[in-house]
């Protein structure tokens, strides 16, 4: 839901598929999940675990580049873990014993060295230098054990990740569960049951992929809503607008207008 009381403020629902490092360059953010709330102050760097669903309230102090993001895919996370493993010897478990937001989102105070390192990493191509620089930045987090556990959990490959990889190869296609079962050589019942164990459905995954791709198209291109709808495999623009609003809590037009100066 968008807060129209302040033109520089927006409330949005977010579900992340990649681990991200966020620099709140010219904005502050309030992140909430259930009864928990966490504030990312202007100038802070935040490490945010993937596969968490959060509500984010963003208040811009400037219309130009309010925040910057580095996205870490699974290969990068695994490389970072290989560096961290010999250094840390934590007795952690993956039991998901109700970890709170402060065990999934980690903050660094505004420090010139950390910000300079973030900016440097953002421009680096994939390689050893980038991996070691990321490990260096992550090592600045005070709760090292919780961070290591968070990264380890985020780097695991789930069954739903396999399905995402298949769908993302052709987002325009009108996917059915039978297409996935054929790709994976599994019965539809087996696919459903494995997704149920992750508390997901095929339709949820499909919606996640489409809405994430729609947001990227709105931000990174001059595509009209009708074009975006078609490019993500939804034939009806009005249906796309409704689903986007339900997913993000804001219409595609308002989403674009708020972010167009980013």
Curated annotation (Swiss-Prot):
The protein's name: Virulence regulon transcriptional activator VirF
GO MF term list: DNA-binding transcription factor activity; sequence-specific DNA binding
UniProt DNA-binding region: 178-199, 225-248
Record keywords: Activator, DNA-binding, Plasmid, Transcription, Transcription regulation, Virulence
SUPFAM superfamilies noted in UniProt: Homeodomain-like
Role: Primary regulator of plasmid-encoded virulence genes. Activates the transcription of icsA (virG) and of virB, which is an activator of the ipaABCD virulence regulon.
Cross-referenced InterPro entries: Homeodomain-like_sf, HTH_AraC, HTH_AraC-typ_CS, Tscrpt_reg_AraC-type_HTH
Organism: Shigella flexneri
Residue stretches in coiled coil: none
Subunit structure: Homodimer.
Conditions for induction: Transcriptionally regulated by FIS at 37 degrees Celsius. Subject to H-NS-mediated transcriptional repression below 32 degrees Celsius and at low pH.
Domain of life: Bacteria
HTH araC/xylS-type domain location: 161-258
């Amino acid at each position: 839901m968008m807060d129209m009381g302040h033109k520089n403020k927006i409330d949005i629902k977010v579900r992340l598929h990649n681990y991200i490092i966020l620099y709140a360059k010219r904005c502050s953010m309030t992140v909430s999940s259930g009864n928990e709330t966490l504030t990312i102050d202007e100038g802070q760097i935040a490490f945010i675990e993937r596969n968490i669903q959060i509500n984010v309230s963003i208040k811009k102090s400037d219309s130009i580049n309010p925040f910057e993001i580095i996205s870490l895919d699974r290969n990068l996370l695994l490389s970072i873990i290989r560096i961290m493993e010999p250094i840390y010897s934590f007795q952690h478990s993956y039991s998901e014993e109700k970890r709170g937001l402060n065990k999934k989102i980690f903050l660094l105070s505004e420090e010139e060295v950390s910000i300079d390192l973030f900016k440097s990493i953002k421009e680096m191509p994939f390689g050893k230098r980038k991996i070691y620089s990321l490990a260096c930045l992550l090592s600045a987090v005070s709760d090292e054990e919780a961070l290591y556990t968070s990264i380890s959990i985020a780097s695991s490959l789930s069954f739903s990740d396999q399905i995402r990889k298949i769908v993302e190869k052709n987002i325009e296609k009108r996917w059915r569960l039978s297409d996935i079962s054929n790709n994976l050589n599994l019965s539809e019942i087996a696919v459903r049951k494995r997704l149920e164990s992750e508390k997901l459905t095929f339709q949820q995954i499909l919606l996640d992929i489409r809405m994430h791709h729609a947001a990227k198209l709105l931000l990174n291109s001059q595509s009209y809503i009708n074009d975006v709808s078609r490019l993500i495999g939804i034939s009806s623009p009005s249906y796309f607008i409704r689903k986007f609003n339900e997913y993000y809590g804001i219409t595609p037009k308002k989403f674009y207008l708020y972010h167009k100066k980013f």
